[in-house]
């Protein structure tokens, strides 16, 4: 129960209330980029609570985009695939790496810059006509 509540506190409550607080002070043309996960759209056994939090983010993105669109504020999310960081320590093991590579079309592990480049794009004026969307940045996993 504690882990479940902690996941929702970090992954849903925090971005929800942060965006709520920022809404009144955001300028026209601003952009919000939240973090989702491909896990929101896959049945991955023990990750059901985590997946539910990321599904909630995908829904919040749509609601926030609708609420802020009149003010010219865009809201999107990225859904990163497996990046070998402390958050996905399993990917640092041979079995975890084999699993991650096995589900990706591009057959390499993502690096933080792979994800950061998409976040930068979504936050930029180059993405001025994109809102309410979650962009998968996962190397083509589960194609």
Describe every region a protein language model picked out.
Residues 24-25, 66-70, 128:
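Alpha-helical segment proximal to the catalytic Tyr-Lys
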Residues 19, 53:
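Active-site helix of classical SDR
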């Amino acid at each position: 129960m504690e882990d479940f509540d902690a996941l929702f506190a970090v992954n849903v409550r925090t971005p929800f209330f942060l965006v709520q607080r920022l809404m009144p002070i955001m300028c026209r043309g601003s952009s919000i980029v939240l973090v989702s996960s491909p896990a929101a759209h896959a049945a991955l056994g023990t990750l059901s609570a985590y997946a539910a939090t990321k599904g909630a983010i995908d829904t919040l993105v749509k609601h926030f985009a609708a609420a802020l669109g009149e003010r010219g504020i865009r809201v999107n999310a990225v859904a990163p695939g497996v990046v070998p960081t402390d958050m996905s320590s399993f990917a640092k093991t041979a079995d975890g790496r084999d699993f991650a590579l096995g589900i990706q079309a591009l057959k390499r592990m993502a690096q933080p810059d792979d994800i950061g480049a998409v976040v930068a794009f979504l936050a930029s004026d180059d993405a001025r006509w994109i809102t309410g969307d979650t962009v998968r940045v996962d190397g083509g996993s589960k194609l």
